[in-house]
């Protein structure tokens, strides 16, 4: 089956973290994981126990997927034997867990081309021109790549990354600045509360007086408004003013129909992230409502050698839980082993008792009296 994508995106960016440089000879590998979220990271672990080294691709420039993008500091309560952890802590622990297997990460790029070869392996090329020939592919891309929903004001995009931001990477960058924060969800409220008292001024704007955020955060924001520590306006941004290429004001039309001009140094917009399945939709996989259909024995797709785990897959009884994705990753690893070691019989071993697994993990085998 030909799985090529028309008009693949590629440039001459040199890849320095493994794989081939753009336009170079593809690297031959055993397993390629698409998605560096928690399930993708645990897929590295399960493959590693079977002595299968993995390469991992993610469209984001950081590891962790939506756990890190959407709720790095939010508590997670349903990871077995971990009563509470944040998205960032979960990611950090998974990275620690997979250290013995030395996975190679290729971040800030998407899979642009997948072609089935006559020998059963797959040719893969990313949007940065990194190339592989791989025996297996594991799609652990959550609900796809995340792109921020942007502010729909003509021409304002030219300030993107300069004075217009959809993510906060370095909070200190906004200290002492006049900020306008737009949005009504947790991210907008969280950053508003964090930056009040650190920024020169903070004005929060939302199109209505209702919020999709924690009630305690909303109450705290209103308390700060009463204390004159910040302002809140109901309205929508419809325009802006600039001087010498610098954003100086935004125009906000309120519920009363009056347009107000607000001075601004930086504009932070939190409209949420829009999941996009992206090129995966063109791979020839069986899809159901933008999710990939799999069997429940190996979590393999309709294309032999391509597996799907985590929120991106669907099957009867599917539950979108991190722990479900971990289970799927374990079975997918065993399902993939025959493609990688066709002559090898895979025996079930346990990390508690197997000297072989202890050696793989780099730990001492316990001595029992």
From Swiss-Prot:
Record field: catalytic activity: 2 reduced [2Fe-2S]-[ferredoxin] + NADP(+) + H(+) = 2 oxidized [2Fe-2S]-[ferredoxin] + NADPH
Binding, FAD: 58, 66, 71, 111, 146, 311, 352
Keywords: FAD, Flavoprotein, NADP, Oxidoreductase
Residue span of region Disordered: 1-23
Necessary cofactors: FAD
Gene3D superfamilies associated with the record: FAD/NAD(P)-binding domain (3.50.50.60)
GO molecular function: ferredoxin-NADP+ reductase activity; flavin adenine dinucleotide binding; NADP binding
Top-level class of the enzyme under EC nomenclature: oxidoreductase
Cofactor, how bound (note): Binds 1 FAD per subunit.
SUPFAM superfamilies in the record: FAD/NAD(P)-binding domain
InterPro entries linked to this entry: FAD/NAD-bd_sf, FAD/NAD-binding_dom, Fd--NADP_Rdtase_type_2, Ferredoxin-NADP_redctase_2
Documented EC number(s): 1.18.1.2
Family the entry assigns: Belongs to the ferredoxin--NADP reductase type 2 family.
Subunit structure, as described in the record: Homodimer.
PANTHER family in alphabetical order: THIOREDOXIN REDUCTASE 1-RELATED-RELATED
Protein name: Ferredoxin--NADP reductase 2
């Amino acid at each position: 089956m030909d799985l090529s994508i028309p008009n693949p995106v590629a440039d001459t960016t040199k890849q320095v973290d493994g794989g081939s440089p753009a336009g170079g000879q593809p690297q031959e590998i055993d397993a390629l994981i698409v998605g560096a979220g928690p399930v993708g990271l645990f897929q590295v672990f399960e493959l590693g126990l079977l002595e299968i080294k993995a390469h991992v691709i993610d469209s984001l420039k950081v590891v962790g997927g939506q756990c890190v993008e959407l709720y790095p500091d939010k508590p997670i309560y349903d990871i077995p034997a971990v009563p509470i952890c944040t998205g960032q802590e979960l990611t950090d622990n998974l990275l620690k867990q997979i250290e013995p297997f030395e996975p190679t990460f290729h971040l800030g790029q998407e899979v642009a081309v997948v072609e089935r070869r006559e020998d059963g392996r797959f040719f893969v090329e990313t949007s940065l021109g990194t190339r592989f020939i791989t025996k297996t592919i594991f799609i652990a891309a959550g609900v796809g790549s995340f792109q921020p929903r942007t502010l729909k004001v003509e021409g304002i995009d030219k300030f993107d990354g300069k004075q217009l931001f959809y993510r906060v990477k370095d909070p200190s960058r906004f200290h002492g600045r006049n900020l306008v924060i737009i949005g009504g969800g947790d991210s907008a409220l969280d950053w508003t509360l964090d930056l009040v008292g650190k920024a020169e001024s903070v004005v929060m704007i939302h199109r209505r007086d209702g919020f999709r955020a924690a009630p305690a955060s909303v109450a705290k924001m209103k308390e700060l408004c009463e204390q004159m520590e910040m302002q809140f306006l109901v309205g929508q941004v419809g325009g802006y003013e600039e001087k010498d290429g610098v954003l100086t004001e935004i125009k906000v039309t309120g519920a009363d129909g009056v347009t107000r001009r607000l001075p601004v140094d930086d504009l932070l917009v939190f409209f949420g992230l829009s999941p996009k399945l992206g090129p995966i939709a063109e791979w020839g996989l069986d899809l159901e409502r933008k999710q990939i259909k799999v069997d429940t024995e190996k979590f393999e797709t309709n294309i032999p050698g391509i597996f799907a785990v985590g929120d991106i897959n669907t099957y009867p009884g599917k539950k979108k839980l991190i722990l479900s994705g971990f289970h799927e990753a374990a079975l997918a690893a065993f399902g993939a082993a025959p493609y990688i070691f066709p002559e090898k019989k895979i025996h079930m071993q346990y990390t508690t008792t197997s000297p072989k697994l202890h050696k793989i993990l780099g730990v001492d085998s316990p001595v029992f009296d």
